[in-house]
Amino acid sequence: RACIELGEDCDGYKDDCQCCRDNAFCSCYEFFGEKNGCGCAVGH
């Protein structure tokens, strides 16, 4: 399956952002209700 490496962009709408790492997720910041700067990040 295709997966996204840590630090790569993700769309912010898939909970796991199809990250290659099991404990990673799609981290975004919201700007006026829009998701921006989404990237694959490791959960804490």
UniProtKB/Swiss-Prot annotation:
PROSITE patterns noted in UniProt: OMEGA_AGA_II_III
Annotated TM spans: none
Xref: Pfam families: Toxin_34
Assigned keywords, A-Z: Calcium channel impairing toxin, Disulfide bond, Ion channel impairing toxin, Knottin, Neurotoxin, Secreted, Toxin, Voltage-gated calcium channel impairing toxin
Ranges in a coiled coil: none
UniProt keyword Secreted present: yes
Highest taxon of the lineage: Eukaryota
A cellular component term, taken from the record's GO annotations: extracellular region
Tissue expression remark: Expressed by the venom gland.
Purpose: Omega-agatoxins are antagonists of voltage-sensitive calcium channels (Cav). Toxic to mice by intracerebroventricular injection.
Stated name of the protein: U17-ctenitoxin-Co1a
Organism: Ctenus ornatus
